[in-house]
Amino acid sequence: VILLSKNNSFIKGAAILSIAGIIVKILGAIYRIPLANIIKDEGMGYYQTAYPFYVLLLTISTSGFPVAIAKLVSEKRALGDHRSAYRVFKVALTGLTIGGLLSSLFVLFMAEDIVRSIDNINAYYSLVALVPALFFVPIMAAFRGFFQGRKNMVPTALSQIGEQFLRVVVGLSLTYYLLDRGIPVAAGGASFGGSAGAILGTVIIFIIFLLHKESIEREVRQTRIQTDYSVGEIIKDLLTIAVPITIGAAIIPTMDTIDAGLVIRRLQSIGYSKETANELYGQLKGFAQTLINLPQVFSVAIGMSLVPAIADANARRNKREIRQIIGSGIRMTLLIGLPCVFGLFVLAKPIINLLYFKNTIETINSSGEILAYLSFGVIFLTLVQALTAMLQGLGKPLIPVINLFIGALLKIILTYILTAIPGINIKGAAISTVVAYATAAILDLILLSKVAKIKFNYRDIFIKPLISALGMAIIVRFSYGFLLKIIGGRLSTILSIGIGGLAYVILLIVTGTITEEDIKFIPKGERLGRYLDKFKLLK
């Protein structure tokens, strides 16, 4: 078992971003669940058709740069070169502002052609409404990368919360207001919430930057190291890191963009109408995929903290610290991801019924089946995110790109084949997604162990969390069946989730998966640790 220092900035950063992520996901649930109940699977189909293309453009213009900025800033600061660290940020901010302007203008003038190319003209309003976000998100990304490189995760956390809050308020308000004008227009109102949130998130992090600017510039003035880190060198270093990451990050939204057209067309090829195919796609992306994305709040937070932490240790050539961080990151990812997999699988239909109860029984049953298949993708998706961050921090960004590309190719092939089989239909897209992430995660893990020269403690990192999660799933299944007979309905689902969470924590302690050192990291952890140790519950 890897012991973690209380002063470990990686853990602290991950905790801050996880808390922010939980708040963001709660707000997201407040947004997506009533949204799906308002515009139904038809509207979610339009919304989700536009969204992957928007994410693709944002990925191209921003995804690799926050990581590149964080890595370079962290490395320069580790060497005491604050002047170069600040120069990296200023050059990146200029480039991202230009990139955001170009991508927003591209969508503004090409929106109609884009939606026609994927044979869904009703998604036009949903796409155009996201144009302002395409400009502001890259700017926000530059500031977030800079603060993350300084190992200050608070500005990112606050801007995330502000961004999501306004997205919810504006998105739901416009959806209600525009509903009388038709589902396509209402879906466009929902999309505009993303633009409103991006503007507020940018404003928040810019204000925080202004508050820190004096101390940042003081650091620069006090820097004794004199280096000629030119603009050309900065651009070269940024692109060297960012381009492979951007290519890798673009694979998933590209995959989703292809899905938007491929899935609907393949469903039509076996007799589904365009409307029904769109509704099934809405169930996949708007209902099931939304729930699959919830555990990512933790893996994304872990990943964002891993890059600067590993880059810092790598710059100091501290191999032991690198191995400790990697082991901790994988273990944390599995501890969170595994119970989500089995919980979503066991309670797939009850959870869909709990959240999307205003939809028809047919929609709830169909979405539940999709979620059951898709649930197994949670652990592989969260692992891919964490392992990708580790390889990026080690200066090997191309490895996860190649592995994810292999997975994406498998997904496209399997989606094409499986979705056109009548007995499988839309579930084929879910199965292919799981296979894609499983392939990428396994390849990442194998190559990471070689790059970092690390031998994993499989019993503590993999086996113990798996046993605890399986035990939890069995308890949840029997609890739900028992409660359903007594109280029925959605309350039994809520209580079963609570019982499952409690059972998982107990099983983690009983199996020795959670140690006394781990307990110390939670509030009042030392007192709790002594209490549990008194009853011989900690190992």
Q: Which residue stretches match the model-derived regions?
A:
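N-terminal membrane topogenesis motif
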Residues: 1-27, 83, 87, 225-252, ...
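Membrane-interface junctions at transmembrane-helix termini in multi-pass inner-membrane proteins
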Residues: 137-159, 376-406
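Helix-loop junctions and terminal segments of transmembrane helices
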Residues: 63-78, 296-319, 326
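Interfacial segments at transmembrane-helix termini and the short loops linking adjacent helices
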Residues: 112-129, 345-378
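Interfacial/gating helices of multi-pass transporter permease domains
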Residues: 36-56, 183, 187-188, 236-241, ...
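Signature of the first transmembrane helix
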Residues: 9-67, 97, 104, 108, ...
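Membrane-proximal transmembrane or re-entrant/amphipathic helices at the cytosolic face
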Residues: 478-539
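Membrane-interface helix-loop junctions in multi-pass transport and translocation proteins
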Residues: 154, 165-203, 208, 398, ...
